[in-house]
Amino acid sequence: MITREEETELVRHIEDLPFKPFDFHGHLANRQVVGFGRRYEYDRREVVEAAPIPDFLLPLRDKVAIFAERFAAEFAQVLVNEYRPGAGIGWHRDKPQFELVAGVSLLAPCNFRLRRRNGGAWDRETIEVEPRSAYLMAGPARNEWEHSIPPVNRHRYSVTFRTLRSNL
C-alpha cells in the first residue's frame, strides 16, 4: 500500500498527535486513539463531528480510496490507533453507522483475527497484517464477522478509515 519512506513520514506526524486511552463507557483500554472527521460517541450512540482530518493523512486516504474503489471524500472518519507492546483489542464489530472499514498497518505486523458464529460453534480465520499493507472489510466480512487483535509484541500504529452508512 505504501513505501517505507511514506511510512516513516506518516509515523513522524503520527507521533505528534494527541493520543488518549480508548474510553468505552468509562473503561480505559490499553490502546490509545485519536480520531478525525467524525467519531462515534458511545454515550449518545451516534456519530458526531470531530477535528478535521489533518493534511498529512489525506494522501493516505486517497490511496485507501483507490484500493477500496471509492471516492476519497466518502471516508469521513479516520481513527489512528497506537498499540504499545502488550496492547490489543477484543472481539467486536464496528458500529452499524459505518459501512466500509479500511485499515493501514504501520511499523509492525499483527494478527488480525476474524470469527463468526456458525450454529453452536465459531468459524475462525487469522490474517497476518504486514507493515505498510492495507485491509478492507466490506459485505459479510464487515457485517457478519467480528474481529480482534491479540496483544502485540512490538509498537505499531494502525490508521482506520470508515465510510458512513447512508441508510441509518
Predicted regions and their residues:
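Non-heme Fe(II) oxygenase metal-center motifs and adjacent flexible, charged/small-residue loops
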Residues: 1-168
